[in-house]
């Protein structure tokens, strides 16, 4: 699942459109966070809502197969706050610093890393500019390939 800045809006969109996506577990976790934190549902109510969502929108859904997963997701959904970030602020100075590299591949990668660092800084006060994203994901998002 790609990085979602505003998980509340994304969850509302998923509910409206009934889109399970390529990673159903990620979708369910996002919906569980929404149900627990925005609609104030308890674990059991969240479990029922997720089960209902899957029955309605996931082809060949088998509740017995998904029961443990949905139960676990419903429990953990309150542990992680639902993100509601509308933008990541990038300054002209930061853009100028990146442009000084004078290599488009490096510039793309540095810009991507800056965005991730600022996102993680908004999510956690303790982050301090750290990027905890797989290097392959950074290259994919930056649309940069590496040749050996």
Regions found by a protein language model. Give the residues of each.
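Modules that initiate DNA replication and primer synthesis
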Residues: 1-148
């Amino acid at each position: 699942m790609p990085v979602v800045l505003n998980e509340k809006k994304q969850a509302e969109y998923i509910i409206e459109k009934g889109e399970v996506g390529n990673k159903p577990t990620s979708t369910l976790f996002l919906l569980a966070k929404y149900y627990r934190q925005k609609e104030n549902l308890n674990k059991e109510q969240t479990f029922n809502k997720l089960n209902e969502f899957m029955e309605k929108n996931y082809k060949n859904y088998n509740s017995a197969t998904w029961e443990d997963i949905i139960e676990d997701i419903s429990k953990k959904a309150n542990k992680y706050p639902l993100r509601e970030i509308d933008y990541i602020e990038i300054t002209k100075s930061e853009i100028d610093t990146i442009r000084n590299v004078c290599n488009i591949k490096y510039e793309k990668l540095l810009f991507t890393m800056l965005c991730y660092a600022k996102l993680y800084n908004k999510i956690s006060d303790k982050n301090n500019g750290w990027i905890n994203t797989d290097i392959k994901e950074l290259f994919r998002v930056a649309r940069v390939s590496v040749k050996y």
